Amino acid sequence: MLRNISLKMDYTKTREIDDYLKHVLKPQRYIHSLGVVEMAGDLASIYGSDVKKARFAGLVHDIAKCFSCETMNRLIRTYGIDLKYYNRPELAHSKVGAAMLKKDFGIDDPEILMAVSSHTAGRYGMSMLEEIVYVA
């Protein structure tokens, strides 16, 4: 069972994004994201990483998971994402999610954006935050 998760973070968009996630994600996906918030925070605490940043990245990591393949393909073109993700929503959602956070929600922290972008397939040379979200 999840502990009481406080979403009081130092990011002004957190409440707006949390409300958005509650409306667009299926309930089980939203619950999954809250679990990632908790696990990412715990791992960040253990490994000396920024707990608030890890929790925020955990919350938003699946922000684009709700889109159909057709919508994902449109967003890939809109955001200028590599076309190798076209018709591959299971991989594209991380790239689209990072682009959404930056362009639609004004999140400009490169560590958070990279953690979201790489959480599905990983990448060589991931930062501690990327590894935390990937594992969480």
Residues of each region from the PLM?
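Generic N-terminal amphipathic, Lys/Arg-enriched alpha-helix
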Residues: 2-5, 9-26
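Divalent metal-dependent catalytic cores for phosphoryl transfer on phosphate-bearing substrates
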Residues: 16-24, 41-136
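All-alpha helical catalytic cores of prenyl diphosphate-utilizing isoprenoid enzymes
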Residues: 29
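N-terminal glycine-rich anion-binding loops that anchor highly charged ligand groups
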Residues: 32-33
